[in-house]
Design a protein with these regions (language model features):
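Carbohydrate-active catalytic/glycan-binding domains of CAZyme proteins
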Residues: 25-381
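Cleavable N-terminal signal peptides of Sec/SRP-targeted secreted and luminal proteins
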Residues: 5-21
C-alpha cells in the first residue's frame, strides 16, 4: 500500500506526528488541508519529508501530514474504543499486532498474547474482529492461532500480496523470524518452512512483485516468498543528522502515492526519565528509491504522546512503540496503531530498579512492569 505495502497487510495504514522542541525549536501545529503551513523555505520535495511537494518555496503537505516540513502526523479525536483494542480487564499483555481489512468488511487484528509481567515468550496469537478499525474488537468469534514461540519484540507485521502464479490474494503474517501464509483471513495460517527474514522485528513491504524488509540500517529484498529464499542488500538507511542519544527502533515501512519510500520508528532516549510527555518518541526516514535515505535536520517527530477521545477524556502515553501505519482501501493513511504502556503518565517511573539506565528507569522502560496494550489513533484528514 503505501499502496504497495500495498496494503501492507491490510489495505490500510495509519500515521501521526509531532514536532518535539529540540535545540531551541518550538512545536508547530498544522494548518488547513493541503495548504502550506507557516512560511518555511524549501527547494525540493525532499525538504518536505516527501510527505508533500515544494510549491513556491513552501511545503504543501499531503493529509494527514502537517507542519513546516510535512513531518508531523495530525491527530483528530479518536473513538474511546481505540484506547485499548484488547480488554484492559485481562491482566495479560499485548504489544500491538497486525490489522487487515477483509473482503467481509471487517477489520481483523492478529495480536500475540503474553503472560502478565512479560512482553515476549508466547505461542498463542489472538484473532479479533471489528466493524470499525478503532473497535471495539470481538475476541471470542475466531479461534486462536498457534505459532512457534516468539521472543519479545518480533512481530507481527503483515503483507497482502498477489501470487503471480495463481493470481490469488495471499495474506501473510511476519513474526518470530518466519512468515505464516493463508488464502483467507480466517486461515488456516501455515508457516512457510525454510524461509526467514533478516534479523528481528520485521518491516516488510511488497512492491512491483518483490519483497523488501528493513533491519537496522539496511534495506533487503528477495523476489519471492519461497523456502530457501535469499535476501540481498537493496539500500542503506543513513542515520546522519539523528540527534545524539536518539535510538530509533521498531520500523514500519511503506510507499506513498508518488512511489516514495518511508520508514517510521519508535525512538527513545535512555537519559530521559522525567517529564515523559515531552520525551523522545518517534522518527521518520524517507527515500525516493529505497536505496538512499534521508532524515531532516529539524529532527521532526512524526507522532506524539497525547491523544483525545470522543468521550471527552485525554490520555498521555508514556511510550508508544511498534508503530503500524493503517491505510484505507483507497490508499489513504487514516490511522496509526501502536504498542502502548497503559498505566504510567508524565511522572515516569525513574525510581524503579529494573531496566534502569544511568541511575534511573527511562520513560520507555516503564512498560516492563506496567500493563502493555494495543492502541490506535485517528489521523486528521
Amino acid at each position: 500500500m503505501a499502496f504497495s505495502r500495498l496494503i501492507p497487510a491490510t489495505a490500510v495504514g495509519l500515521v501521526l506526528a509531532l514536532v518535539r522542541p529540540v535545540a531551541g525549536r518550538s512545536g508547530i501545529s498544522g494548518g488547513p488541508r493541503g495548504a502550506p503551513v507557516r512560511a518555511a523555505s524549501c527547494a525540493a520535495d525532499l525538504d518536505c519529508s516527501l510527505n508533500g511537494v515544494c510549491v513556491g518555496g513552501a511545503c504543501r503537505c499531503d493529509p494527514p501530514w502537517t507542519g513546516p516540513v510535512c513531518g508531523v502526523l495530525s491527530y483528530k479525536t479518536t473513538p474511546a474504543s481505540g484506547r485499548s483494542l484488547y480488554p484492559e480487564s485481562d491482566p495479560r499483555n499485548t504489544w500491538n499486532g497486525a490489522i487487515i481489512r477483509g473482503i467481509d468488511g471487517l477489520y481483523h487484528l492478529f495480536n500475540p498474547i503474553y503472560k502478565p509481567g512479560t512482553l515476549g515468550g508466547t505461542s498463542t496469537m489472538l484473532h479479533g474482529t471489528a466493524a470499525s478499525v478503532t473497535g471495539p474488537y470481538q475476541w471470542n468469534t475466531r479461534p486462536n492461532i498457534t505459532i512457534s514461540e516468539i521472543g519479545a519484540f518480533d512481530g507481527p507485521k503483515s503483507v497482502v500480496y498477489t501470487d503471480p502464479e495463481t493470481n490469488s490474494t495471499k495474506y501473510t503474517l511476519w513474526l518470530g523470524g518466519g512468515v505464516y501464509i493463508a488464502d483467507s483471513l480466517d486461515g488456516p495460517f501455515t508457516r512457510l518452512e525454510g524461509f526467514k527474514y533478516p534479523g528481528a522485528n520485521p518491516a516488510p513491504l511488497w512492491h512491483q512483485g518483490a519483497f523488501y524488509a528493513n533491519y537496522g540500517t539496511t534495506i533487503y529484498t528477495t523476489p519471492r516468498l519461497v523456502s530457501g529464499a535469499r535476501w540481498t542488500e537493496h539500500g542503506a538507511v543513513s542515520h546522519e543528522g539523528v540527534p545524539a542519544n536518539w535510538l530509533p527502533e521498531d520500523p514500519d515501512m511503506w510507499m506513498d502515492k508518488r512511489n516514495n519510500w518511508h520508514i517510521i520508528n519508535h525512538a527513545y532516549d535512555n537519559y530521559e526519565w522525567q517529564h515523559c510527555a515531552t520525551s523522545v518518541l518517534s522518527s521518520h526516514f524517507f527515500s525516493q528509491d529505497g536505496k538512499t535515505w534521508h532524515f531532516l535536520p529539524q529532527a521532526v517527530q512524526p507522532y506524539s504522546h497525547t491523544v483525545q477521545y470522543d468521550d471527552g477524556t485525554t490520555h498521555m502515553f508514556v511510550t508508544l512503540e511498534r508503530p503500524n501505519m493503517f491505510f484505507d482501501e483507497t490508499g489513504l493513511l487514516t490511522h496509526i496503531h501502536l504498542a502502548a504502556d497503559l498505566v504510567t503518565g508524565d511522572e515516569g517511573c525513574g525510581n524503579r530498579t529494573n531496566h534502569s539506565h544511568y541511575g534511573h528507569v527511562p520513560c520507555d522502560n516503564c512498560k516492563y512492569e506496567d500493563h502493555g496494550g494495543t492502541t490506535i489513533i485517528a489521523l486528521g484528514l
